[in-house]
Structure formats: structure tokens, C-alpha cells
Amino acid sequence: MHVLHEPSAISFDKVGIRGKIFPSRELSNKAGFVLINTQAGHETTIIEHESDFIYYVLEGSGFFEVNDKKEECSAGDLVVIPAGSKFTYKGKLKMLLVNTPPWREEQEETL
């Protein structure tokens, strides 16, 4: 099936964010898709070593800090974070995250 419905269960709840991971690996091994909800933001700063992260802000507002540069974001904005970047984000946000290649826990470094 090519239509993936929003997962009903939370896939993870950590460091200030809750996420629902779409089961897309059987359709594509080149990208992963995650629905992110946060009330206050990411509690840590990370470096994602292998995947580009592309966030589309569906609701809310806040800011991303990427490589020590802070930029505000709100609904309708697209935030592109290249692999190897140091980043965090804050705010009450609902976002669709596309990561390419798909995210794996071992490729992420928490600072």
C-alpha cells in the first residue's frame, strides 16, 4: 500500500519530544518519516552524522538553532538540516520530519 496513515501509537517519548514513526521502510529505503510533537522543544543538542533532516512545521512556532545560528520558525516553514550539523529546537511545535537516509540511533550523537 502506498498510503500510510498516521500511526495511532507513540513510537518514542524522550528529551522533550514525542514521535510517531511511519512504517515506510517497505516502500522506501531512502527516507524515513516521523510526526513530531513537542510542548517546549528538544531538551538536548545533537549531531546527526549521516542523515539530512528536513522538518516541515505543521502547527505552532519556535526556533531552531543550527551550528550556533538561531532562526525562528512557524507553521508553513521548512527547516533543512544537513548531515553533520549541530542542532536543537525549542517551542510548541507539530512537525513532519523527513530524514534521508532513514535515521538510525547509532548515527546520532548527543552533546
Language model regions located:
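Glycine- and acidic-residue-biased ligand/ion/polar-headgroup-sensing regions
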Residues: E50-G62, N67-D68
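Conserved short histidine dyad/triad with adjacent acidic residue
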Residues: G32-H49
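A short, N-terminal "cap"/entry segment at the start of jelly-roll beta-barrel domains
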Residues: M1-G32, T45, T110-L111
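Residues at the C-termini of beta-strands that transition into short coil/loop
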Residues: P7, N37, N99
